Amino acid sequence: MLRLILPTLTLFALLISGPAAAQTVKESAALATMSGSALMKMPAKKLFGSQKKPADLAARAIGSYAKGCLAGAKSLPVNGPAWQVMRLSRNRNWGHPDLVALIEKLATESKQFDGWNGLLVGDLAQPRGGPMLSGHASHQVGLDADVWLTQMPDRILTNGERENLEATLVVKDRKTIDTSVWTEAHARLIKRAASYPEVARIFVHPPIKAELCKWATGDRSWLAKLRPYYGHNYHFHIRINCPRGSTTCKNQPPSRPADGTGCGAELAYWMSDVPWAKRKADPNAKPPKPAPPLTLAALPAECRAVLTVQ
């Protein structure tokens, strides 16, 4: 029993130092040699949040967007001809190769055709996907990416600027677009992203969807992919479909609003007070117990191999 406890304690000591600590071969070996039961009980966000390099396996998105992992990840270069990656300290510029290719295509085409000077790219996924130590519930299988609604400057940002530069809000409040910030280039950028067939959904703040519903002409079917959701007032969130070869990846149901665009009842709901209303707390109710952390056991079985391969 002591032989199992000591490696587990050692591994916890390595992991609690956080994502800034460099992963070593010794750490990978410790994961690979732990007993299955001990490893499965560990918090998945600690295990995956400590990984610094991708799993040297064939590229596969495994599981669902909010419960899975990523094999064979590819990094989006931090600087490109039409993009720059932000918040480099997070080491979240990893994705399935299909996602990385799509971001590069969107950056290049929006600069060439849409009057968008270049993308500032936020989080994709961790090197091996999985739950994160902070932030997103999704972004676990390398098929999600955040793109800022701020144009790239005409120079290379310093690392310090990438950590501290604030993105520009494009809304005044939860119902109103800020017309002093919003431009037609914003609209063309989002339309281009939604028009790619591999894109499943794009999450935006409700007034952004409302503005695009007013702006769009001709074929408006791309609007169906735009889903209003909280917190997307300075960036939009691209989600692509499961790639070919990712046989255990789970797609979400296609976005098919009844009106064909989502500009009707669905948008009206998000522009109302209902989704934003705070529930009244019962003063006599006992405080709920916090949910236990997601463990490796809760993820698809393949994620253990993704985690432990050296």
What are these model-derived regions, one by one?
Residues D56-V121, W182-R192, Y196:
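Active-site acidic/histidine clusters and adjacent loop/turn architecture
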Residues T24-G36, M40, E161-Q310:
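Catalytic cores and adjacent binding grooves of peptidoglycan-active enzymes
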Residues S17-P19:
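N-terminal signal peptide c-region/cleavage motif recognized by signal peptidases
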Residues M1-L9:
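Bacterial N-terminal signal peptides that target proteins for export
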Residues F48-Q51, L102-S134, F203-K225:
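Extended, low-complexity, intrinsically disordered C-terminal regulatory tails
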